[in-house]
Amino acid sequence: MLALLLSSLRARAEPEPEPTKPVLRTRDASLASILRGPFPSSRLFSMPAADTVGAYVLTLSGDASLLQQPGALTSAGLLAIGFGDIAQLEYRHTSAISVTGINAPLPAVGVQLKIPIPERPNVPAFGIAFRLGVPRTEIFGDTNVEETVTDFYLVGRLRFELARWLTLHGGARISSAKIELSGDRMFESSRRLVLPTGGYELAMNPTAKIIGEIALAPQFMWDPAGTADPKIDYGLLGRFGFRWAIVPSFTLDGSIGYQVDVASAAPDDGPSAIVQWDIRLGAEVFVPWGALACRAAGVFCD
């Protein structure tokens, strides 16, 4: 990862090429032209972008790390299917901090929409996303802990005509977080949180970019050995890394993430406020299933 970043930094930052329209879904389209894209990503790392994967396109992405919790594989993933140019259905892991204190993403199903505003230079694009949380259960002795987060996102994306290598992202995440204890202890609590989120993309060349994001996220807090009831607060999650398109339909990414306990951190703590960090490697695959089905069987054609 470091070698790729250094080589990219040595290269002159070229502007991103103008987005081109996908090849029409026709029976005579070549396989090479179908897989040439373009294939926009609908995410930074965990933050949604104001874009969808495109009509009749499926994307599968994931990343994992062994460093965040020694001896345990922590991972997150996304499966999205585009229907039309502005909508996609998805199953994904949304960011949250579990009672164990680590960034343990929670499963969710939802829909993401791009607001249909004509693309113009220096005019932001906007998107919304709704994610219905799926409960995740952790077991501590005879106590079951169930954590759920349901989210609504409003995000924006801005590209500059004079600096096409730079893309800014920002928005807000409205989360309804719930924690429930069962088994030998009974307790239930929920809280609504408004969480700002932001990020950026720096295009180093037409196939590689540096990506960063920072956001507040729900944090579940409970000590199984204590007598206090669980509570829901918020923590800060940041991530910085690269994304490299080996071919248009397949990208690799690597990133360094960190976690700050906002509730207990003092303004002058500096780096000591970081309570967790990790290194994650991942990939994203785009499958233009509509164009492939049209070429093979004459269905889903334009």
Predicted feature residues:
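Intrinsic disorder and flexible/low-complexity segments
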Residues: 3-5
